[in-house]
Regions:
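Catalytic core of tubulin tyrosine ligase-like
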Residues: 160-161
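Rossmann-like NAD(P) dinucleotide-binding subdomain of oxidoreductase/dehydrogenase enzymes
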Residues: 1-71
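Residue-level signal for inorganic ion chemistry
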Residues: 36, 101, 164
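Alpha-helix termination/capping residues and helix-transition junctions
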Residues: 30, 92, 170-173
Length: 182
């Protein structure tokens, strides 16, 4: 791809040795780096911010949402949610929060709960989601913005796509840029 776009093929490099001393030394190479964009959990992001001597674009921790609209194929939605939540729980792009249109909550949530039982996923939700499925326990205010990295899923029921967008925008991870102080 680099060659096709007439970009130097050495512009992208892979460091195969993941030893912390090597990666920390790499983060200090102003002669090779213009910016770092760490993707991972809070510990990785904090380590890059604390050790880098080049600017860092902090992506924040992951609080990935899935919105299921009233027009969705429910079987497909269950499969997507199951995969996104349980395939690799410890990655920053794992689903942590589910937002569901109120018109499908009664059909979707019990079906989803049965599937998530295969992996013992704990479901934490608002009153509307609890009314639709007895397996859902109450969510706290902290649950909406939490990166669990665990078999836990928060669930919010909404009345419109606009309300879903507002909820997601309120609770997704923040992004900011840090300039090194050293």
């Amino acid at each position: 791809a680099l060659r096709a776009c007439k970009v130097d093929e050495d512009a992208i490099q892979l460091i195969e040795d993941t030893d912390r001393a090597i990666t920390t030394a790499f983060m200090k190479r102003k002669d090779f780096l213009d910016v770092l964009i760490p993707r991972g959990g809070a510990g990785l992001i904090r380590a890059v911010v604390e050790n880098s001597t080049v600017p860092v674009i902090e992506t924040g921790t992951g609080n990935c949402h899935i919105y299921v609209d009233e027009s969705a194929d429910l079987d497909m939605a269950v499969n997507i949610i199951f995969n996104a939540k349980t395939q690799r729980i410890g990655v920053c792009n794992a689903c942590e929060s589910l937002v569901v249109h109120e018109n499908i909550k009664d059909a979707l949530l019990p079906k989803l709960a049965e599937r998530l039982k295969e992996k013992n996923v704990e479901m934490r939700g608002d009153k509307a989601s609890q009314d639709a499925c007895s397996d859902i326990i109450p969510a706290s205010d902290e649950d909406w913005g939490k990166e669990y990295l665990d078999y836990i899923l928060s669930i919010k029921v909404v009345s419109s796509v606009e309300e879903a967008i507002a909820h997601i925008n309120k609770y997704l991870s923040l992004i900011h840029i840090s300039e090194p102080t050293r």
